């Protein structure tokens, strides 16, 4: 067998084993909590239009900004192969500095505090 067939065989066997274990394990000790659906703490029968905390929205926006930062800076190690790597690293440093200053400003303004 070649390498691709071996990898496919191992992946299929591992998937089958995990599927069988996932069906077998819950039957060992069933109780009420394991049999009930996961509800995330929200009332499923109440109104869906509940007020949403602005703190959660702010944390989500900060997470998206820093996630975008990681996505932009991830290919940075290959930046030394460009014609002008110094300029690339200067731009990356300026992006990091700008986001760090924004985070410090948000922290000093109290936007990251949960209790008021």
UniProtKB/Swiss-Prot annotation:
Transmembrane segment boundaries = 3-23, 56-76, 87-107
Keywords in alphabetical order? Electron transport, Membrane, Mitochondrion, NAD, Respiratory chain, Translocase, Transmembrane, Transmembrane helix, Transport, Ubiquinone
Keyword set includes Cytoplasm:
no
**What's the name of the protein?**
NADH-ubiquinone oxidoreductase chain 3
What does it catalyze? a ubiquinone + NADH + 5 H(+)(in) = a ubiquinol + NAD(+) + 4 H(+)(out)
A Gene Ontology CC term for this entry? NADH dehydrogenase complex
GO molecular function terms noted in the UniProt entry: NADH dehydrogenase (ubiquinone) activity
The superkingdom of the source organism is Eukaryota
Top class in the EC scheme: translocase
Family indicated by similarity: Belongs to the complex I subunit 3 family.
Please report the record's description of how this protein sits within the membrane: Multi-pass membrane protein
One Pfam match = Oxidored_q4
Matching InterPro entries, A to Z?
Answer: NADH_UbQ/plastoQ_OxRdtase_su3, NDAH_ubi_oxred_su3_sf
Provide the primary localization: mitochondrion
Species assigned in the record: Gadus morhua (Atlantic cod)
Please tell me whether the keyword Transmembrane is annotated for this protein: yes
Q: What this chain does, per the record?
A: Core subunit of the mitochondrial membrane respiratory chain NADH dehydrogenase (Complex I) that is believed to belong to the minimal assembly required for catalysis. Complex I functions in the transfer of electrons from NADH to the respiratory chain. The immediate electron acceptor for the enzyme is believed to be ubiquinone.
EC number(s) given by UniProt: 7.1.1.2
- UniProt subcellular location: Mitochondrion membrane
């Amino acid at each position: 067998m070649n390498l691709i067939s071996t990898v496919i065989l191992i992946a299929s066997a591992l998937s089958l084993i995990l599927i069988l274990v996932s069906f077998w394990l819950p039957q060992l000790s069933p109780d009420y909590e394991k049999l009930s659906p996961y509800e995330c703490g929200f009332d499923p029968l109440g109104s869906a239009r509940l007020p949403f905390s602005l703190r959660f929205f702010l944390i989500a926006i900060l997470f998206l900004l820093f996630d975008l930062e990681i996505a932009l800076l991830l290919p940075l190690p290959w930046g030394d192969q460009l014609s002008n790597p110094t300029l690339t690293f200067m731009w990356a440093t300026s992006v990091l500095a700008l986001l760090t200053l924004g985070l410090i400003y948000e922290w000093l303004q109290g936007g990251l505090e949960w209790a008021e």
